[in-house]
UniProtKB/Swiss-Prot annotation:
Protein name: Cleavage and polyadenylation specificity factor subunit 3-I
Amino-acid biosynthesis among keywords: no
Source organism, top-level taxon: Eukaryota
Cellular localization per UniProt: Nucleus
Family (UniProt): Belongs to the metallo-beta-lactamase superfamily. RNA-metabolizing metallo-beta-lactamase-like family. INTS11 subfamily.
Tissue: Highly expressed in carpels. Also detected in seedlings, roots, stems, leaves, flowers and siliques.
Length: 693
């Protein structure tokens, strides 16, 4: 492991009540070990880490506190490894709640998950009413689980995440989540010590803003692996030498494989033990070993090097044992049996049969959850209650030799000092052990800049983060570095919490979006001469091209290469253009102009009284037309408090008096453009009257 002198650079995130709120709530494993499930919410995104059950409870009482959340709001559920206390409520959550998000775990975890949970359903001694799920639910859940490779980055609804090797068991992962630039590391169960078949947990290359970390071992320090292995083999050798039997209760997968590797090697080196059988007693024995034989390349160099000659998980001195009926209990033997907590199954049956004989021994090889028989017998009570309800003396020797693949204090403190997270949340530990760990860790970070929190179940931790919004130019826009004051024009594309600016024609290249052109076409009643329209348009617009329609032979105009004005018949004019903001404004002004020309004809025959009234109304409409035409030419046109029109172009301002036509502006170029444009508009919308007054 790297020393603390090589620690990562801490990410300094400004935190205040004004920032975005991030919430972390343990729904399980808060000041306890069991039913790991941690809820996290930030900027409208919701994540669940793990989905386990409590081994000491049954039925609904074993579940995490799912009623504290809305399952339908969860975007992503990340499972760190296959152990019951981290994955066993997943079938229930997927099939019995409103959850419709996505679920991820590693390949090895998914392979073992189904085996382990199918066995869990079979060996559980609970009533039908207390059954949380059945094999059908497990099979359905398999269809919904997606797999992720180590170091593969996945993005779901703006949530980015990837995983690192965690040690602990085959396929175990630590997940790093990134939401809007805020990073959260969830370790799950991890170990920084390489053992006989697993790599040590990796150190992420990024320092997270928050580290949610297990605290199972508290402030305890593990013995060295060699000392533990020697104690383990010495107890077994001495027990069988005096004719006793050795029971090793263990989970079907995980530490069991590590211990089997030790036993097989020890038996190979001691010919005097070859007549004493070793059994791996689990209904899953053969299937489990097949999985381990498949995922050799996911293990450490030691195993992979051995695999070049032979598969190390094809044991020479260990036989599978599927049930108690297949066991010939005569003479000394070593049996590794499931489940590890001695709640039921083969391990409990053998314990009940052997516990009264002082020649026998029981080795507890790892951490045991409160409330289980395995945890109880570590304290060596005089009597135990058997499965049939009777009591029996506990005469067999009980040895606690921890092969727990959980980080001890030395590993945890070193890992955190290398990682340097400003916020640490402790989970997955007994309350007292967790508090001792917190106090000791505070001495490792005396600067006071590190917050360490120990929330209980359903107790939320709230933090606030200010995240900047940055837009990156990509594609053609990124080829040239703009100078200060330059304008960069493009389309802003938001995906999740990232922003990119790109050229419109590169939208399909750098995003999953595609472009489409909307062609607009309208027909307007018009009975006048087409030449009048041409004359008026040329007065207003700088670019008006005349042509003849090839099919009909009727005249047509192209205004600013955007809008086509065509005579459809003696009574109709059509406009056609590809829709965009500028073309839409040009077409609006042309429509207004044509309608205004159409309205001039009735004025010739109006009576004088009606003509005066019409002129007043027409005057208002003319003002609207003038305004629309100015907007189409200059864009930003507003009516000022003094009654003058205020026109802004590229930071320059001009004021236009609608009555006199006078223009005021410090920018001579803009002043002249506005004056000429207004004169052209005036001549187009206020022509010489056809009737003499």
């Amino acid at each position: 492991m790297a020393s603390s002198s090589t620690s990562l650079k801490r990410r300094e995130q400004p935190i205040s009540r004004d920032g975005d709120q991030l919430i972390v709530t343990p729904l399980g494993a808060g000041s306890e070990v069991g039913r790991s499930c941690v809820y996290m919410s930030f900027r409208g995104k919701n994540i669940l880490f793990d989905c386990g059950i409590h081994p000491a409870y049954s039925g609904m009482a074993a579940l995490p506190y799912f009623d504290e959340i809305d399952p339908s709001s969860i975007d992503v559920l990340l499972i760190t490894h296959f152990h019951i206390d981290h994955a066993a409520s997943l079938p229930y959550f997927l099939e019995k709640t409103t959850f419709n998000g996505r679920v991820f775990m590693t390949h090895a975890t998914k392979a073992i998950y189904k085996l382990l949970l199918t066995d869990y359903v079979k060996v559980s001694k609970v009533s039908v009413e207390d059954m949380l799920f059945d094999e059908q639910d497990i099979n359905k859940s398999m269809d919904k689980i997606e797999v992720i490779d180590f170091h593969q980055t996945v993005e779901v609804n703006g949530i980015k995440f990837w995983c690192y090797t965690a040690g602990h068991v085959l396929g175990a992962a630590m997940f790093m989540v990134d939401i809007a630039g805020v990073r959260i590391l969830y370790t799950g169960d991890y170990s920084r010590e390489e053992d006989r078949h697993l790599r040590a947990a990796e150190l992420p290359q990024f320092s997270p803003d928050i580290c949610i970390i297990e605290s199972t071992s508290g402030v305890q320090l593990h013995q060295s692996r060699h000392i533990r292995e020697k104690r383990f083999t010495d107890v077994i050798h001495s027990t069988v030498a005096q004719g006793g039997r050795v029971l090793i209760p263990a989970f079907a997968l995980g530490r069991a494989q590590e211990l089997l590797l030790i036993l097989d090697e020890y038996w190979a080196n001691h010919p005097d033990l070859h007549n004493i059988p070793i059994y791996y007693a689990s209904p899953l024995a053969k299937k489990c070993m097949a999985v381990y034989q498949t995922y050799i390349l996911s293990m450490n160099d030691r195993i992979r090097n051995q695999f070049a000659n032979s598969n190390p998980f094809v044991f020479k001195h260990i036989s599978p044992l599927n049930s108690i009926d297949d066991f010939n209990d005569v003479g000394p033997s070593v049996v590794m049996a499931t489940p590890g907590g001695l709640q039921s199954g083969l391990s409990r049956q053998l314990f009940d049969s052997w516990c009264s004989d002082k020649k026998n021994a029981c080795i507890i090889p790892g951490y045991m959850v409160e409330g289980t028989l395995a945890k109880t017998i570590i304290n060596e009570p005089k009597e135990v209650t058997l499965m049939n309800g009777l009591t029996a003396p506990l005469n067999m020797q009980v040895h606690y030799i921890s092969f727990s693949a959980h980080a001890d204090y030395a590993q945890t403190s070193t890992f955190l000092k290398e990682l340097m997270p400003p916020n640490i949340i402790l989970v997955h530990g007994e309350a007292n052990e967790m508090m001792r760990l917190k106090q000791k860790l505070l001495t490792e970070f005396p600067d006071g800049n590190t917050k360490i929190m120990t929330p209980k179940n359903c107790e939320s931790v709230e933090m606030y983060f200010n995240s900047e919004k940055l837009a990156k130019t990509i594609g053609r826009l990124a080829e040239k570095t703009p100078d200060v004051g330059d304008t960069v024009s493009g389309i802003l594309v938001k995906k999740g919490f990232t922003y990119q600016i790109m050229a419109p024609d590169e939208l399909h290249v750098f995003s999953q979006l595609s472009t489409a052109t909307v062609t607009q076409r309208i027909t307007i009643p018009f009975v006048g001469a087409f030449g009048v329209i041409k004359h008026r348009l040329e007065k207003i617009f700088e670019s008006v091209e005349f042509s003849t329609d090839e099919e009909s032979g009727l005249p047509a105009l192209k205004v600013h290469e955007r809008v086509t004005v065509k005579q459809e018949s003696e009574k109709h004019i059509s406009l056609q253009w590809s829709s965009d903001p500028i073309s839409d404004m040009v077409s609006d002004s042309i429509v207004a102009l044509i309608l205004n020309i159409s309205r001039e004809v009735p004025k010739i025959v109006m009576e004088e009284e009606d003509a005066v009234k019409s002129e007043e109304e027409n005057g208002k409409k003319v003002e609207k037309v003038i305004y629309a035409l100015l907007v189409s030419l200059f864009g930003d046109v507003k009516l000022g408090e003094n009654g003058k029109l205020v026109i802004r172009v590229d930071g320059n301002v001009a004021q236009l008096d609608k009555e006199s036509g006078e223009v005021e502006s410090e920018h001579s170029g803009l002043k002249e453009r506005v004056r000429v444009a207004f004169e052209r508009i005036q001549s187009a919308v206020k022509p010489i009257p056809l009737s003499a007054s």
